C-alpha cells in the first residue's frame, strides 16, 4: 500500500492524532526517501541494542518434557550473552480532544473516515468488557456501525470499530468510507453511535451475540502449537497470568449489560474524538458545518507530513 493511498493516510493519521508523539502514534517510513535514509549500520546497531536474551521471551510447545525444552534452549541460546538494555521514556499521549483534520484530495469521489480516541491497556481490569463494548459497536459480524451505515442508510460497503490494546495504553478507532456527497451524514452517524453506547443499555441479544463470538472464536487461537506459543508469549509480554488462558471464556460470560454501559461511560469520549477525513474537501466542507463539525483543519495532501508537529511539510519540502 503506497504512502499516498487514502486508506493508508487515514489509518496513519488517526493513530498520530490519538497518540501524539508517543511511539504508538509515530508513523513508520512513509516515503522512498525515508526508507533510503535507513542504513545497514542503523540495522546492526538496533539489533545489537535490543536483541539480547534479557530482553527476549521464549515459548516451546510440543511433545517434549520441560527438561527437554530447557536443554534444547540451552543448546541453542546458551552462548548468547546478556547486555544492558537502555531505559526508554515516552511522551504521554495527549488527553482526548476534539480535532477534525481533513486531508484534501481534489477530485476524489470517496472519503475515508476515521474516528478515534485513546483507550485502556491490555492489562486493564476492564479489558474484556471494553473489548466486548467495541465489538458491539463495530466488531466482526453484525455490529451497530454496519447496521446504521450500511443496512439502514446504504452509505458504505463496510464499517467497523477496532480496539487496539497495547502495553502502555490503547486506541478505539472506527472506520468506514463513503461517497463524497454523504461524508457529513456518515460522520455524524458514526459519532452518534459512540454517544448511544453510553446513553442506552445494549440489547441483551447484542450482548449474547458478542459473547458467543468471543467465546467461540477463542479456541481457534489455541488450536495449534504455534498459536498456543503466541498466546503464551503475549501473556508473558503483557505481564498477565497464564491462568487467564483457562478462564477467558468465563470472563466473557460474566460481562453484563450494565458492565457494557459502565465502561462506555467511563472510557468513551464522544465529544472529544479525533476525526480524520481523506477526500475532496470542497465536496463535503459544507456538510461538516451542517452536521455540527464547524471547526476543522484542511491540509492539502501534498503538504501532509505525519512527523511534523503541525502535520504540514516545511515550505521548502512542499510539491505545490
Regions found by a protein language model. Name each.
Residues 6-33, 55-61, 110-121, 146-257, ...:
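M16 family metallopeptidases and their MPP-like homologs
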Residues 1-2, 92-104, 212-221:
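Short, conserved secondary-structure transition motifs
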Residues 69, 145, 186, 263, ...:
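Hydrophobic side chains in well-ordered alpha-helices
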Residues 3-7, 71, 123-127, 183-186, ...:
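Solvent-exposed, non-transmembrane alpha-helical starts
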Residues 115, 124-137, 144-147:
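Active/ligand-binding-proximal structured segments within catalytic/core domains
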Residues 20, 57-121, 277-316:
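An aromatic/glycine/proline-enriched structural segment found at the starts
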Amino acid at each position: 500500500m503506497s504512502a499516498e493511498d487514502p486508506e493508508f493516510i487515514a489509518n496513519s493519521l488517526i493513530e498520530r492524532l490519538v497518540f501524539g508523539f508517543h511511539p504508538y502514534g509515530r508513523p513508520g517510513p512513509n516515503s522512498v526517501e525515508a526508507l533510503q535514509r535507513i542504513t545497514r549500520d542503523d540495522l546492526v546497531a538496533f539489533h545489537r541494542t535490543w536483541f539480547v536474551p534479557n530482553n527476549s521471551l521464549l515459548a516451546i510447545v510440543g511433545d517434549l518434557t520441560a527438561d527437554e525444552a530447557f536443554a534444547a534452549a540451552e543448546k541453542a541460546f546458551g552462548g548468547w550473552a546478556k547486555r544492558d538494555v537502555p531505559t526508554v521514556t515516552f511522551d504521554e499521549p495527549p488527553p482526548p480532544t476534539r480535532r477534525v483534520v481533513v486531508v484534501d484530495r481534489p477530485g476524489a469521489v470517496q472519503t475515508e473516515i476515521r474516528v478515534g480516541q485513546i483507550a485502556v491497556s491490555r492489562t486493564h481490569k476492564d479489558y474484556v468488557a471494553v473489548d466486548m463494548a467495541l465489538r458491539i459497536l463495530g466488531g466482526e459480524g453484525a455490529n451497530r456501525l454496519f447496521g446504521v451505515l450500511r443496512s439502514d442508510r446504504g452509505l458504505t460497503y463496510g464499517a467497523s470499530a477496532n480496539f487496539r490494546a497495547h502495553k502502555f495504553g490503547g486506541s478505539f478507532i472506527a472506520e468506514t468510507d463513503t461517497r463524497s456527497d454523504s461524508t457529513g451524514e456518515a460522520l455524524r452517524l458514526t459519532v452518534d453511535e459512540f454517544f448511544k453506547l453510553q446513553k442506552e443499555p445494549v440489547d441483551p441479544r447484542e450482548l449474547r451475540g458478542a459473547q458467543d463470538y468471543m467465546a467461540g472464536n477463542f479456541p481457534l487461537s489455541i488450536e495449534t502449537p504455534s498459536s498456543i506459543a503466541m498466546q503464551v508469549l503475549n501473556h508473558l509480554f503483557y505481564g498477565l497470568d497464564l491462568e487467564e488462558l483457562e478462564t477467558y471464556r468465563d470472563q466473557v460470560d460474566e460481562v453484563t449489560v450494565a458492565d457494557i454501559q459502565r465502561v462506555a461511560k467511563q472510557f468513551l469520549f464522544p465529544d472529544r474524538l479525533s476525526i480524520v477525513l481523506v477526500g475532496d474537501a470542497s465536496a463535503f466542507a459544507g456538510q461538516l458545518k451542517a452536521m455540527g463539525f464547524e471547526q476543522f483543519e484542511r491540509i492539502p495532501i501534498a503538504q501532509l507530513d505525519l512527523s511534523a508537529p503541525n502535520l504540514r511539510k516545511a515550505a521548502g519540502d512542499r510539491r505545490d
